[in-house]
A protein has these predicted regions:
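Positively charged, solvent-exposed patches that mediate nucleic-acid binding
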Residues: 1-127
Length: 127
C-alpha cells in the first residue's frame, strides 16, 4: 500500500514564464470566492502543478500577502489528492493557479473550507 504524504514539493509548484503565460493565455477560469481558479489541461511530466497568488493591489503589506499565500498553499496541500487521482486516472496533466481576490484576511479554517469547495468545483468542471 502506498503512503500518501501531505506535502507540496517544489516539483508541484507551477513556475516559469512559459508555463505561467500559457496557463493565463489558454486556460479557463472560474470564481469560487475568495479565489479565482485558472486551469489548463496540458502535457507535462507531473500530474498536477499549482501556483498561488496574493496580489499587491489588494494587500499592500508583504506580511499580509505572505500569510494569504501560506494559507492557500496549506489548504491545497491538505486537499490535493482528489485532483491527483483525477489526473492519474484520466492520464492527463493539470496546471492551475489560485489567485486570492478577497480584500480581507480570513482565518485559516475558513480559507481551507473555501479552497476545498473550489477544488471540488474544479473537479466538477474537469468532468
Amino acid at each position: 500500500m502506498e503512503v500518501r504524504r501531505n506535502t507540496f514539493p517544489k516539483e508541484e509548484h507551477l513556475y516559469g514564464q512559459t508555463a505561467v503565460d500559457m496557463l493565463f493565455r489558454k486556460g479557463k477560469s472560474f470564481l469560487a470566492f475568495p479565489v479565482k481558479v485558472t486551469y489548463l489541461v496540458t502535457t507535462d511530466e507531473l500530474p498536477v502543478r499549482c501556483m498561488v497568488v496574493a496580489p499587491k493591489k489588494k494587500f499592500k503589506h508583504a506580511v499580509d500577502r505572505n500569510r494569504v499565500k501560506r494559507q492557500l498553499r496549506e489548504a491545497y496541500r491538505k486537499n490535493k489528492f482528489g485532483l491527483q487521482d483525477w489526473a492519474v486516472s484520466h492520464e492527463q496533466q493539470l496546471h492551475f493557479s489560485m489567485v486570492y481576490v478577497g480584500d480581507r484576511l480570513m482565518p485559516s479554517n475558513v480559507v481551507e473550507r473555501k479552497i476545498k469547495v473550489a477544488l471540488e468545483k474544479l473537479l466538477e468542471k474537469l468532468g
